[in-house]
């Protein structure tokens, strides 16, 4: 299990480096998918299966749609590829930063890292499912605000990417 988690953590950092080096928006989309999948895999290994599924569906369903519009807006005739020197040096610098940060973190203790089901013997329900009831009861106002902000973001992206044509909002 420790090898599995170490592999997932390394893949998470590699995906983040792929997004940060960002040779072109098309290649960064692959990094986003890797980070979303690996992050949800880490959540599953710590016992948050429901939360992991919800985050994966929301992230890939919502954010990649907005990312597709941004990639269409920033279309380049000759995008930088992974084999270019500039991208290679960016990856090397980010990798060096990760190695230095890992050196600092490995000298201390692990902090407050614990599983979601650490006290499952004393609980009747799972910890990640109980957050759903809280989201719809006490967090209902915040849920409506977040839905409104996401709808507004979608309209902003549609307006920005429409160019000189009349766009989608004319039909609404």
Swiss-Prot record:
Keyword Glycoprotein: no
Domain of life from the UniProt record: Eukaryota
EC number, UniProt record: 7.1.1.2
InterPro entries in the cross-refs: ComplexI_Subunit6, NADH_UbQ/plastoQ_OxRdtase_su6
Membrane topology value: Multi-pass membrane protein
Pfam families per record: Oxidored_q3
Protein family according to the UniProt entry: Belongs to the complex I subunit 6 family.
Entry protein name: NADH-ubiquinone oxidoreductase chain 6
Organism: Danio rerio
Gene label: mt-nd6
């Amino acid at each position: 299990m420790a090898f599995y988690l170490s592999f997932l953590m390394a893949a998470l950092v590699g995906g983040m480096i792929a997004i940060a080096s960002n040779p072109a928006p098309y290649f960064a989309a692959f990094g986003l998918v890797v980070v979303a999948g690996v992050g949800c895999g880490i959540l599953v290994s710590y016992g948050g299966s429901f939360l992991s599924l919800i985050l994966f569906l929301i992230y890939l369903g919502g954010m990649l749609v907005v990312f597709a519009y941004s990639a269409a807006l920033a279309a380049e005739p000759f995008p930088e590829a992974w084999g270019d020197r500039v991208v290679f040096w960016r990856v090397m610098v980010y990798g060096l930063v990760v190695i230095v940060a890992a050196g600092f973190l490995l000298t201390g203790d692990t902090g407050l890292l614990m599983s979601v089901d650490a006290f499952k013997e004393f609980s009747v329900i799972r910890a990640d499912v109980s957050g759903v009831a809280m989201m719809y009861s006490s967090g209902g106002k915040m849920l409506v605000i977040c839905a409104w902000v996401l709808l507004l973001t979608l309209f902003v992206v549609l307006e920005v990417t429409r160019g000189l044509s009349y766009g989608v909002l004319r039909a609404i």
